């Protein structure tokens, strides 16, 4: 998606440790117009898949998931990274390693909101090593819900997570795919 790629080149910051900072428009300060365009593009990619629900993980995926959900006319369910007192004891749970934060979290969703037969589109802001997608897919598997695919805003294609999951048969549509990235050379898209 050229609009997104142009914005990444303009305002994204490549930092040491293979980190792309897009906090000025994706995952801290949200450019609602841009994320709505991303949501619209994801709708066009998945509109024929009869989505019942969008699933994401807190916190950075929530904004774009909500904007995409407006186009699909479906609710958004987000996996929490910690079980809180306002969620029932009846939950699906999976472990997810975070590339950005360098830790492992237990993610949970209430069994009240993820149901057998649901047709789920997973949406997230980044795809690097694939751990978040694997965890979200596992929650759906536990619920006997069907993952119809994943919509990703930015994929670090060179880290291999997306290619591994595609090889397993998962449909993944990424709006911006980064072929390589470094502080010295900047960003090259696929």
Residues covered by each model-derived region:
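PRPP-associated nucleotide enzymes
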Residues: 1-123, 127-190
């Amino acid at each position: 998606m050229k609009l997104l790629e142009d914005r990444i080149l303009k305002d994204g910051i490549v930092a040491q440790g293979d980190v792309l900072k897009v906090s000025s428009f994706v995952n801290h300060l949200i450019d609602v117009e841009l994320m709505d365009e991303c949501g619209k593009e994801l709708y066009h990619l998945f509109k024929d898949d009869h989505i019942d629900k969008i699933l994401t993980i807190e916190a950075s995926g929530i904004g774009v998931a909500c904007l995409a959900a407006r186009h699909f006319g479906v609710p958004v369910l987000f996996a929490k990274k910690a079980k809180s007192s306002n969620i029932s004891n009846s939950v699906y749970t999976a472990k997810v390693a975070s590339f950005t934060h360098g830790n492992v979290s237990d993610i949970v969703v209430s069994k009240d909101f993820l149901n057998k037969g649901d047709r789920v589109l997973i949406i997230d802001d980044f795809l690097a090593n694939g751990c978040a997608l694997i965890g979200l897919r596992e929650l759906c598997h536990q619920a006997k819900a069907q993952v119809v695919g994943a919509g990703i805003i930015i994929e670090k294609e060179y880290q291999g997570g997306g290619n591994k999951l595609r090889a397993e048969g998962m449909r993944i549509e990424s709006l911006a795919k980064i072929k390589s990235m470094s502080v010295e050379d900047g960003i090259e898209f696929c």
